[in-house]
Amino acid sequence: NVAKEGCYDFVVVTHQGDSAMTRIKWVSANPLEEPSRDMLKRSAGGLLSKKQAQFDIDALVYTLSEVHPDMFSVCRQSEWFKSVNRVKQQLPDSVTTVELFKYAAPLVTKLGDGHTMLRFPFNDYFTSSTIRLPLFLNVKSDYTLRVRGCIDNLIPQDAEVLSINGKESRELIESMMDYASGERDFFRIERINSDFSALFEMMYAADKYDVVYRMKDSKKKLEVTLHPTTWAELLPRMPKKKEQARVLDYSFKVDEKKKVAVMDFRSFNNPQRTKMFADSMFVTLREKGIKNLIIDLRNNGGGNSMVGDVLFRYISPKPFKQMGKALVRVTPTTIRLTGRTQMVPGWSFYNDESKGNFIPPLTKEEGHYEGSVYLLISHHTFSSAGSFAWAFKEFGMGTVIGEESGGMNVSFGDIIYYKLPVSGLSCTISFKRFWQYGADEKEIHGTLPDYAVPQEGALAKAFQLIKK
């Protein structure tokens, strides 16, 4: 019975009287899953040694290969492992967790899976003493930066930042793409938008920031110098935000003169509540003789896909389904990390397209909507909202207007959480692959609109089409 980390010294004596000193020592059967105490021991200052950083990268590579259903669907295997070796060789003698993230995150990004990523260690970097750029920015899909807020309102909200310390906005954004997982650049820019402050500090922290900007709808360039501050100093000096009314998951308005209703659809939550909402909305449209319905999905990040099925029953001209196929990989590592002991190791492939289990639409008597339907989508239409947009077009439910959706027709998903053993860096890894109904992995893309316009102009385009 050798205890974990145990070490036992004793003398072995043969029946002839010969003896030998013998040591029995506990060694992990798989050190990448169960490292030794010595490997996990950090320095007093919290730094990782080069050996520990290399170990964390090896553990990351091992776990990715044990969990992900198709690591190399985008990146060539040989090129990826060359990158792994290069990063391990480039590591300095010691690193912080943030520095390890800077080295390792691009390796995960290369896999091209928007759900598989290394997460920035915000709590390790941003402390009460951290000084930071006192400027908050929105990153746009056209590679521009718009001001969300600035200390003392030195740069007004919605002004366009052209450069910071001589680095133009496009250059800043492009340099951060290595840290943004995703299948499309616009999807990755959305990731950068969420993490911009952290990535900027990691890559471009300075003693002062010379910012060149211009006001909205102006070509005149203006300049200001900002100095880094702590969060405690920054917060009371930020412009006060206007109180915003809570946005409902779904709501609708009727324009009786134009005979048009607009459904503002923000989130796929609560199928039961959706059913009550849909009943009420379609009764209203029927009573008022509204023959055109615009469903606005431009700022919908997804949720429960059953919500989509509820709405589809009112608008689909024929039986429908959202999901086509799914591939699931389960390994002992998957089971260990999820804690789902009921899982059985192996591969499972589900082909719903070969089955006849389509969902029937409502009959006219049950409340089916007989008018024209227009769907507005954007690069921000993700997850279940992306699936909704795909099925809407695939089953001919109406006209799609806007930008390619952020959610792809073939994608990896259903993530597990994994922490690198020494640094504690957090990672999400997909263990399933999904195909929307009728999708082909040879042509991976989001839902393509029938009328491609910038998302800001999608509603106006819908009204224009209705007027015709």
Segments predicted by a language model, with ranges:
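Flexible, low-complexity junctional segments that flank or bridge functional domains
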Residues: 16-293, 297-327, 372, 409, ...
